[in-house]
Amino acid sequence: PHELKQSRADIPEIARTLGEILGKDPIWIEEQAADIKRRYKQVGTRIDEETAGKIRDYINEKGISGIHLEPTSQRVYPYETLAAQVVGFTNASNEGCEGVEAAYNSFLAGSTGRVITTKGNNEMDMPFSYENYVSSRQGDSVILTLDATVQACLEKQLSAAIARYDVQNGAFGLVMNCKTGEILAMATLGSYDPNKYLEIADTDTAAQLEEMKRVYLAQPEGSEAYEAGKTAYGEALSAARLKQWRNRVISDGYEPGSTFKVLTMSAALDCGAIDLNTPFHCSGSEQIPGRAQRLHCWRSTGHGAEKTPQALQNSCNIAFAHIALKLGGERFYEYVKNFGVLEKTGIDLAGESKGVFFDKALVTDTDKWGTASLTSGSFGQTFKITPLQLVRAIASVVNGGQLLEPYIVSEILDADGNTVMKAEPTVVRRTVSKETSDTMRTLIESVVTEGTAKNAKVAGFSIGGKTGTSEKIDVFDENGQRVQDKIVSFVGIAPMDDPEYIILAALDTPSRETGIYISGGVMAAPTVGAVMADVLPYLGVKQSFSEDDIAGKQIAMEDLTGMTAKDAQSLLKKEGLTAAISGSGETVTGQIPSPGQTVPGGSQVLLFFGQTPEPETVKVPDFYGMNRQQASDAAGALGLYILVTGNDEISTGVTVTAQNAPKDTEVPAGTTITLVFADTAA
């Protein structure tokens, strides 16, 4: 400011020009320029090179003295939106905000070098003064447990589910190592770009904000309408930013729904309240002792006679209400406490909450309060926990009974590469016995093979899991009526013989307009299945195919040209393939599929003798809604193969819900199209 005044610069004109270039209020810039008591005033930070160039041109054109550009450093996020809520960002002052940036700011920041010297009353250096130099310290490097490939796969499948089911309020999910507590992926969608953290990433929200801004700017400045509109715009902008920065996996509680049944059944088996042969009967609804209203199962016609395994496979609310009564309020509450539901997980991220559970008396004093809280709580309703709390608890059920402290930072290195901190798995406490854990692994796997989660199947992998569908009981419409919005979820575990990875996917408010039945089994289970199909091979989990699921095995075609018919057929047979022969001759002269293409196990390969097939491309049909037979016929007519993923039952109700190649994509004949099958009926 002092330099500008001495140069007799046209400060109002400078303020207008800089305001236009920087997108800032010219009046505010003029106020900064008028503060001549300060040596300098900062009016812009983190400006890009294009903007800096415009300012340089303006300075040179006008010959202005008193405007300076200083090079600075800033954090660059090359992965952009990937894991944005986990990583966080640094603000204009290079301070860590949100996520890892906030939690580990003291390690990442380092310290700035400085010179301590004497100044005159105009903040200018004095002659013959002393100077003391303090060296800078580089910040440490923080190494995350996140795997970029796994994170990208999780976000890709959540995004696909949002589009497929017209999900209204985003999605969240995570991938954790069951044995260590390491977080391999953690996602909240919609996301944002930490490089542009102040920009609203959601286009609809951004458009609404722009309209609010346009409306208030159209009012006379200083008028009541102008000021009210400006305030409302500022509040809405702030709320939108906070929403997109929020990590729902650790910060937001939600009703877990039927995924919580894993914990209830584990507790009841562990203390002997039930065994595998305990009988139940579900008629669709029942007047449970201690409840004012009849309890309804999700299946209105009921499940009939069941034993413990079927109660979990069918996700039967009536059976679980009786399990809760057998367990009793005291034991139920103590197991819930042991599972970590009443406490934060301790993850090394800023902003973790612990959800909201019942007051102990509501569960234990059933003489006074009835059994509504106890029985509803047994199947995950009328309380809230965070997604991470749930995943940590279920991981303990399948890993032998050890409740782990999840972590996101594996190691911290100083500027010289020396280890400052190295994370190790931390066991908090035991939740259930190893014997109970072994039993539960078998039961959880049966939910995928025989129960409500068949849509999560991935050929060649042993997968277990539990579906969940919960109502958002605290959401109301403009008339104060409770809406029927739902969160659908699925927790999947693999491989079940020795669990390593646990994956949660949750979709917040799928639209009814799609006509697809809204449930965790229909929507979230195939989403997790798709994540597993992507990441399990990458993580080194080996596939093992039985004769029943050989069609799910992908076989890379070898080059059979030059082989005799006998040798080619013998090689194909070893791979679980058959051959059809076209033409005559001693050796193979061509083949469909071509060498290097993949085909499902059990497929037929076309071998040419004495002729070479002309290269041919075909358009991929729209398989959506077809059952297995229809899809097979449509593919076969075009010389295509199909790889079945998801629900492998052959039924008219099990249909294609997704395909890896869009309709009308041109592909070579012999290409394998991956189809996701799911039972979308209620």
Descriptions of predicted regions:
Residues 1, 154, 176-184:
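Short, glycine-anchored, charge-dense loop/turn motifs used at functional sites
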Residues 27-38, 74, 167-180, 281-285, ...:
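Acidic/histidine-enriched alpha-helical segments
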Residues 1-8, 15-18, 37-46, 87-91, ...:
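Second-shell loop/turn segments in exported
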Residues 40, 127-171:
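Conserved, well-ordered alpha-helix/loop/beta-strand core segments that scaffold catalytic motifs
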Residues 423, 460, 464, 474, ...:
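Ligand-recognition elements built from short beta-strands and adjacent flexible loops
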Residues 4-9, 13-21, 27-139, 481-482, ...:
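Small/polar-residue-rich segments within soluble enzyme cores
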Residues 120-133, 171, 179-258, 263-507, ...:
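Beta-lactam-recognizing serine transpeptidase/beta-lactamase-like catalytic domain environment
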Residues 9-16, 20, 27, 45, ...:
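Solvent-exposed, polar/charged alpha-helical surfaces in well-ordered, non-transmembrane soluble domains
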